Amino acid sequence: MGTSSEVSLAHHRDIFHYYVSLKTFFEVTGENRDRSNSTRAQKARAKLLKLSSSQFYELSTDVSDELQRRIGEDANQPDYLLPKANFHMKRNQARQKLANLSQTRFNDLLDDILFEIKRRGFDKDLDAPRPPLPQPMKQEVSKDSDDTARTSTNSSSVTQVAPNVSVQPSLVIPKMASIDWSSEEEEEEQVKEKPNEPEGKQTSMDEKKEAKPALNPIVTDSDLPDSQVLARDITSMARTPTTTHKNYWDVNDSPIIKVDKDIDNEKGPEQLKSPEVQRAENNNPNSEMEDKVKELTDLNSDLHLQIEDLNAKLASLTSEKEKEKKEEKEEKEKEKNLKINYTIDESFQKELLSLNSQIGELSIENENLKQKISEFELHQKKNDNHNDLKITDGFISKYSSADGLIPAQYILNANNLIIQFTTRLSAVPIGDSTAISHQIGEELFQILSQLSNLISQLLLSADLLQYKDQVILLKASLSHAITSIRYFSVYGPVLIPKITVQAAVSEVCFAMCNLIDSAKIKSDSNGESTTSNEGNRQVLEYSSPTATTPMTPTFPSTSGINMKKGFINPRKPASFLNDVEEEESPVKPLKITQKAINSPIIRPSSSNGVPTTSRKPSGTGLFSLMIDSSIAKNSSHKEDNDKYVSPIKAVTSASNSASSNISEIPKLTLPPQAKIGTVIPPSENQVPNIKIENTEEDNKRSDITNEISVKPTSSIADKLKQFEQSSEKKSSPKENPIAKEEMDSKPKLSNKFITSMNDVSTDDSSSDGNENDDADDDDDFTYMALKQTMKREGSKIEKNNDSKLPANIVELDLHESPESVKIESPESIKEITSSEMSSEMPSSSLPKRLVEDVEPSEMPEKGASVESVRKKNFQEPLGNVESPDMTQKVKSLGMTGKAVGPESDSRVESPGMTGQIKSLNMAGKVVGPEADSRVESPGMKEQIKSLGMTGKITAQESIKSPEAARKLASSGEVDKIESPRMVRESESLEAVGNTIPSNMTVKMESPNLKGNTVSEPQEIRRDIASSEPIENVDPPKVLKKIVFPKAVNRTGSPKSVEKTPSSATLKKSGLPEPNSQIVSPELAKNSPLAPIKKNVELRETNKPHTETITSVEPTNKDANTSWRDADLNRTIKREEEDEDFDRVNHNIQITGAYTKTGKIDYHKIPVDRKAKSEAEVHTSEEDIDESNNVNGKRADAQIHITERKHAFVNPTENSQVKKTSHSPFLNSKPVQYENSESNGGINNHIKIKNTGETTAHDEKHYSDDDDSSYQFVPMKHEEQEQEQNRSEEEESEDDDEEEEDSDFDVDTFDIENPDNTLSELLLYLEHQTMDVISTIQSLLTSIKKPQVTKGNLRGESNAINQVIGQMVDATSISMEQSRNANLKKHGDWVVQSLRDCSRRMTILCQLTGDGILAKEKSDQDYADKNFKQRLAGIAFDVAKCTKELVKTVEEASLKDEINYLNSKLK
C-alpha cells in the first residue's frame, strides 16, 4: 500500500482498531447517516484530507479516547480527557475541547474520521490472513500475464505490420486519467467493491473458490470474448458508488488502460493470421462470428449452471459438516457431564446421609435443652412471684402522709396482682388457637377480678370529690383493661396483640400512681385516719351530687360541744361542704364571678322541696350561672328523694312539726369550734342575757353583751334546751290567739336550723384548711388578714364594751359570737347576719339589756328621757329581731315598759342595712295592739295591724337582703338580723330596759305578710348564683347576735330581687300564702311596712360601689362626719375594686350603710334621738310625723333601695321595689319608708351600731400590718357623730338623685342618646355585663362538653357579640361628649379591646353584624379542639374587658360625684 511508507504498522493497527470501535459505535447507536451531500461534511472531510498521516493518527487517537471516555461506565471518570505529559500542550488543550462538543457534533466528527479512515485504507486488518480470492484480481492478473505473453510473442509482428491505432489513445487516456485515478485507489476500489456486494453472494463465491480452486482457470479473460470482458469491467465500474472518489495510485491499473489492452489483445490474433485465413474469414465473417458467439454463450451458460450447482452442493456439505461437528461436541460434553455428575452425586449422598443423622441427633438434644430452659424459667418466675414486694421506708416517707387515705397493704396487693397478671400474659404462646386464648382469658379475668375488688376497696378509702379526677381515671383504666382482656380472650393473640393488654394494665398502674400521689399513703402509725376518712366519706354523701369541686379530705379538730341529744353537729360536713362548689359545669368560674360566688346565698327551691337546677344555660343575672359552694350548701334542702341530704337533724317535736312547713332550710356551715350562745328566755318581764361565745383556735371567749340577769356560764346545750322550751311555751295556748295563730301558721325552726345557720360561718381551719389546694382563691392572704383583724376587733370590743359602745348597742364580734366564724365572703357574712342574726331573740331580754346599757351621758345630750332612749333602742332591735318568740314576747314594747304597737315594727335591709326599722312607737306610750303602722306600697295600702296586745306586739320588719329574704320565715320567726345594722339594732334591743315586757316580740316582716292576710307576695329573691326565686326560710329559734361590718352589704345577682312576687310565686315557694303571715290581719294592717316599689333593678357589677351614707341623721349633724363618711365610702370602693367578693374588707369599714327613711323634716327630729352608729336606721320624719297617733295613724313609708343594695320585695304587700342601680356590694343608699309611727310622736331614730365600725378606730392602732385600705370610723366621739349627721343630711339631699337611679330601666335606655349621664351608662353597662358573664359561663360549660356542636357555640357567641356591640356603642357615644373627658382617657383602649374581641369572635364563628346567625354546614359537626380553645380565649378576654369597662365608667362617674360633693362642701 502507498501509506505503508508514512505510517508504521503499529499505527496502522491502532487506526484499524479505532475504525472498528467507531464503526461498532455507530452500529450500536444507529447514529450513522449519509452526510455526503452535506456541505459542512464536505468541508470537514476536505480538511481531514489535508492532514498528514501522523496528524491524522493523532486526531483519530484523540477522538477514539474521547469516545471511550463518553461511553465509559466508570462514575469516577473525569469530565474531560486528562492531559498527558508526553503530549504537546496544544494537543492536550485540543483533547480537552473535545469534551465540550455536543453529542451531535461529536457524532459528525466520528463519521468524518470513519470516512477518512476508509479513504486512507486503514480499515483493513494487517494481522488477518488475506482472503485467497478476490476473483477479479486473479482474473486480471492472469489476464495481464496472458496479455504480456501475447504482446511479447506478437511484438514483432505488431511492429512489423503497422502502428497500432489504439496505442495513441491508450497513451493519451492514461495521461488524462492519471489526473483522477491512481493504481492504488483502484486496488482500494476493488477491495471496497467486495463489501458492497451482497454478503451471501460474496460468501458463496469465496466458498466456491476455496472448495474448488481448479475451476478458477475455467473462467478466465482469455476464454471470454473481449466484449464480455469489457462489459464486465464497465459493469464493475458502474457498481462502484459514484459518490466515492477512487484514487488509483498506479496508472496501469486504470480500467481504461485495461480496455485498451483488451482491444489490443483481440486485434493481435487477427493480425497474426495468414492472409489466406483472413480471406476465408472475410468471406464468411458474419457466420463465424455468430457461431462463436453462440458457442461461447452456451458454454458460458453451462458454466454458470455448473457453478451454481456446485455452490449449492458446497453450501449443503459445509452445513452438514458443521452440524456433525456440533453434535459430536455436544455428545462429548454430555459424556463428561455424566461422569462428573455421577461422582458428585455419590459424594453428596454420602455427606447428606451423615448430616441427616447429625441433624436428628442435634434436634433431639435441642428439644431437650429447650424443655429444660422452659422448666427453669417457669421455676424462676414462680420463685419471683412468691417473693412479695415490700414497700420500703423511703417509699413510705415519700408518698405517705399523716392525712393519707390509701392503706399501704392495698398497694402491695395490687402490685402483686399486676405482676401475676403480666407474668401470665407473657406466657401466652403466639398462636391462633382459640381454645388456648379462652383458657388464658379465664385466668387473666380471675386475676383482674381480684385486682378490681382491691381497687374498689381502695376507692372506698380515697373516693373523695377532691380526688374525683384521679378516681375517674382509675375506674376508666380498669374498665379499659377488662375490655382488652375480653377481646383478647375472644379473638386471641393473632388479632389482639399482647401489647394491647399490657398497655391497658399499664394504664391501671399509672392511674393508681396518680391517686397515690394525690391521696397519699396512710402510714401504719396513723390508725385513726381510717375512721376519720370513713366519716368524711359519709359526709360526702350529703354533698350535692353535682358538686365538682374537690372536697378537702382533712378537717380541723373540733372541740367537743355538748349539743342536745339528736342534734347532729354539722361542723365537719360544713367545714368541707363549704368548699364544695355546686355546679353542674366543671368549667372554672371566671374570676369576675368568683367575687359573687363566695357569697352564701340560699338557693331557691321548688314547692316540693327539691332544689331547682343549680344553673341555667344562660341566665338573666350576671352571676346566675355561677353558684358558690356556700350557696350550694346554704340553699340545698332535704329533698323527697334524698338527693340533697341535709346534715342537720331535727331535734324537737316542735322543730319537726315546723319543718313540714319549711319550704327551704338552708344548709349552712358551722365553725367547728364555735359554741352557740343561746338566750335563755326568762319570765315575762325578765330580760334574758344573750351571750354569744366563740371558741376559735385560740379558744377565745367573750361575752358580747353585758350579762345582766342570766348565768353567763350556762352551757350551750342548756341554753338550747331552755330556748326551745321557751319557744314551745310561746306557742302554748296561753299566748295571744293571734300570736298563736301566727306560730301555727309559720314553720318552726329548731336546732336543726340553728346549726344550719351556724354552718354559714366557717372556721379558719374548716373553711381554709385546704384552701392551699384551691388555685382559684387569689385572696387567701387578704382573707386571713381580715380574719385576724376581725378577731382583734372582737377582743377590743369586749374590752371596751361599756366605755366605747352606746348603751343601747350590743356588740358582737365575728369571732366572739358562737356563730361568728371566718366569713369567707360578703355573702357568707350576709348569710350569717341573715340567718344567725335573725335567730330568735327573746324580746324581753333585749329591751332590758338595752335599758341597762344606755349611757347616761348620751341621754342628757339627746335631751330625751330614759324611756325615749329605750324606745330608740327598742326600735333598733325591733328592726333586727324577728322570731315567733319575739313576736310573742315583744308584743307591746312600750318603751316605758309598755307594749309597743306593731308600728314599732322596723324594716331592715341587710346588705345595705337599707331596711328601715319601722318607727317604733317611741312616745313612751303603750302601743295598743291596735296601734297601726301602715305599710304602704303602690300595690298595698293595707295597714298591718298589730297583733292582739296580750302583751305582744309584732313589729314587722321586712328584711331586704338576699339572705334576709330567704331567712325570713313564716310568722313564727324571730326578726332576722340580716346585716350589721340589723345586728346593731338587735343589740340595741337589749339596751331597752326592763320596761319592755318579755312577752313583747319584735317581728320582722315575714315574707308572706301582705295586707291583712298578707298571703300575696312572698318575699322572693334570687340568689347570686341562681336566677330562681328564693323563699324565705324560718330562722332558728336561737338568737345569735353578730355585729358584722358592712361587708354584709354585698349582695348577689341583680336579679336577686324579683319584682313583686305574686301569690303564685308564694305557692311555688311552698309557703302557704295566708299561713305564712307573720302578722295577724290586725297586725298586718297596723304594721308600718313601707311600700317597696315593685320594679327592682339591682346594679350588680364586679366593681366596688362607693358606699353612700344613706341613713337619715337627726338635726344635730356634723358636716365633718359626712365628709369623713364620704371618704370612707370612697376608700371602701377603691379597696373593693381590687378585692374579690370573698374579701371581707367590708367587715372592717362599715361606713355609709344607712337606712334612710323617706322624706325627713329635720326640724321634727329631736336632738336626743341622734343615732350612734353609721349604720343607722332612721325613721323618716313622715314616719315620725304621725307617730303621735298611738292609735294607728298610718304613714306611708317608701323604701328607697339605694344604688348599691338589692331591693327586696316586701312580702307583706304587693310592694313595688324600685329598680336601683345595683352592684355586687350592696352599699346601701337610703331606704326611704314613708312610715308613720302611730303610737308615738317620738321621732324614732334608730341607730344600729356596727361592731366593725366601733372597733375600726382601734383597728387602726393595733393592726398596722393589716391592709391599710381598711379605714375605720371610731363611733365613740361626738364629733364623729356630728360628722355623720352632716353626711346624712347630704345624703338626704341626694335622695331624689338616688331615687332616679332606682327607677333605671335597662330596656328603656337609649344607647344613641348623647345626653346619657355616666351614672345611667354605668347602670346600663352593669346590666349588660350580667348577661355577658352569664352567657360566657354557659359558653364555657358548653365548650367543656365533648359532644357540643359548632352551631351551639356559634349561637352563644352571637349572643355575646351582640351585647358587647351595644356596650361598645353606648360607651363610645358617651366618650365623645366633652364633659366625659375622664372616661375617654382610660375608656378608649378598653372599648378598642372589646371591639377587637368582637371582631375576633365574628371571624372565628362566622357571625354577621346584624345579629342574624346564618346557618353553616358545619353547625352539626362537633367543635374541634382548636375552635374551642380559641373561642374560650376570646370569651375570657371579653369577660376581662367588660369588667374593666364597667370599672372605668364607674371611676369616671365617681370622679364626677366627688367633684360634685366637693362643690357642695365648699
From Swiss-Prot:
Q: Which GO terms describe its cellular component?
A: actomyosin contractile ring; cell cortex; cell cortex of growing cell tip; cellular bud neck; cellular bud tip; incipient cellular bud site; mating projection tip; polarisome
Query: Composition bias, kind Polar residues: at what positions?
Result: 150-163, 526-536, 705-716, 1050-1066, 1107-1123, 1211-1238
Any Pfam family hit: GIT_SHD
Chain positions found as Phosphoserine: 182-183, 254, 274, 301, 585, 599, 646, 817, 820, 865, 883, 910, 937, 961, 979, 1053, 1056, 1080, 1173, 1180, 1263
Record's compositionally biased regions (Acidic residues) = 761-781, 1288-1312
State its location(s): Cell tip
Report the superkingdom from the record.
Eukaryota
Q: Give the Low complexity compositional bias ranges.
A: 543-559, 831-848
Q: Which residues form a coiled coil?
A: 286-388, 1169-1189, 1275-1302
Region annotation (Disordered) ranges: 123-163, 181-223, 261-290, 522-562, 676-782, 816-915, 954-1086, 1098-1130, 1171-1246, 1276-1312
Q: How does it assemble?
A: Interacts with SHS1.
Query: What name goes with this protein?
Result: Protein SPA2
- Look up and give the organism this protein is from: Saccharomyces cerevisiae (strain ATCC 204508 / S288c)
